[in-house]
């Protein structure tokens, strides 16, 4: 019931296997369904992640796909097992900015449609705000703050969270950023 989507679609897909082989692998390993059922499941999951028509993708190899298409294959490989919980290790950080939002929207829609929950690991607070209902901030390998997304971003408590939020660049120079009184000595003492 637990699966993972890796950060780098260029490294997480076997370059010697076709897209069909890559997505079939978990079904084959766990001996799920017969050959026809497995083939049908692969076609359906490709449609689900927006790789249509599926027959155009099945015989191809990862190097023949764009970064966004590769990440869709990674998502398909993960979801073919019908997990309830997916660990997402920065699944959009290796993608072109123009593709990121479409992958994030796909993941959000799939979470609703397939009733999947994500643990979304990211260093990008803008992505966390877009993707997450709750955020946990880690400092030195420990969770130091957990809150609803907007609550954490608007009213951080831990000094590291405050420092992290204060470091986010603001594209509008006339924007007045909320200034946090950060005690750097206190933060350094936590290290």
Name every feature range the model reports, one short phrase each.
Residues 52, 148-191:
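Charged, flexible cofactor/metal-binding loops and thiol motifs
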């Amino acid at each position: 019931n637990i699966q993972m989507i890796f950060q780098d679609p260029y490294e997480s897909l076997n370059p010697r296997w076709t897209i069909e082989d890559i997505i079939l692998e978990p079904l084959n390993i766990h001996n799920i369904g017969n050959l026809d059922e497995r083939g049908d499941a692969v076609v359906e999951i490709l449609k689900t992640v927006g790789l249509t028509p599926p027959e155009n993708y099945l015989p191809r190899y990862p190097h023949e796909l764009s970064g966004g298409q590769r990440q869709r294959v990674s998502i398909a490989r993960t979801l073919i097992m019908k997990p309830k919980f997916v660990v997402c290790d920065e699944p959009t950080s290796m993608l072109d900015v123009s593709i990121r939002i479409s992958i994030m929207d796909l993941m959000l829609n799939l979470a609703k449609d397939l009733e999947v929950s994500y643990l979304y690991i990211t260093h990008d607070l803008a992505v966390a705000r877009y993707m997450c209902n709750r955020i946990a901030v880690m400092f030195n390998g420990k969770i130091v703050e957990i809150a609803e997304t907007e609550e954490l971003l608007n009213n951080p408590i831990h000094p590291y969270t405050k420092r992290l939020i204060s470091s986010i660049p603001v594209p509008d120079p006339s924007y007045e950023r909320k200034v946090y009184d950060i005690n750097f000595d206190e933060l350094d003492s936590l290290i």
